[in-house]
Design a protein with these regions (language model features):
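Selective for proline/serine-rich intrinsically disordered segments
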Residues: 4, 15, 131-134, 174
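Surface-exposed, polar helix/loop patches in the mature regions of secreted/periplasmic/lumenal proteins
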Residues: 90-149
Length: 181
């Protein structure tokens, strides 16, 4: 009679799972389930120019005399799932002379308002709310048109001392206002 060595035991153990896998398992009871899910559209807030893009440069003009501000306006299109959204400036608007950074425009003012409506002043750290018109039907995004207006007075000094190319960066945040359920 042969004795089983540890090697033979290992070989015998290798065949045990094969025997266990060959067993038939019978399932009884409920074998199907119905799963339902609700998919919600993500909250959309898209701000563009009229052509679906964005502005690369807005050129300010001084239409009055030397003591009048330089101004520019831009038309914005706001598409939103929610009717209400809020806007704030990320940083104060600073318009500097590219050759002489010490020369800056004074009292910059940034406003936004419904097209043809009252303009609201935008500022850093303060959210200002706006509302798009009602959508034409339920489940459709609202679309509103707004006028962005920027104005600032030229730097102190005469025309000869302040002449030059000026630039600045306008950084704003648009956020949807979410209602609690």
């Amino acid at each position: 009679m042969k004795t089983l060595t540890p090697r033979n035991w290992l070989i015998a153990l290798l065949f045990v799972p094969i025997v266990a896998l060959s067993q038939t398992v019978v399932l009884t009871g409920k074998t199907e389930s119905k799963v339902t899910a609700r998919v919600f559209n993500p909250n959309v807030l898209e701000v563009t120019d009229d052509n679906g893009g964005w502005f690369t440069n807005l050129e300010m003009q001084q239409l009055g005399g030397w003591d009048t501000p330089y101004e520019v306006q831009a038309r914005l299109r706001v598409v939103s799932m929610n009717k209400t959204f809020q806007v704030r400036l990320d940083d104060p608007l600073t318009i500097r002379n590219q050759s002489n950074p010490a020369q800056v425009f004074r009292s910059p003012n940034v406003t936004l308002g419904n097209e043809g409506g009252e303009q609201k002043v935008l500022s850093v750290g303060r959210n200002t709310q706006f509302s798009n018109p009602e959508p034409p039907e339920d489940g459709v995004d609202t679309v509103g048109h707004y006028t962005l207006a920027i104005s600032a007075y030229p730097p102190e000094g005469d025309f000869r001392s302040t002449v030059g190319a000026y630039s600045g960066v306008l950084s704003m945040t648009f956020e949807p206002v979410v209602k609690a359920p």
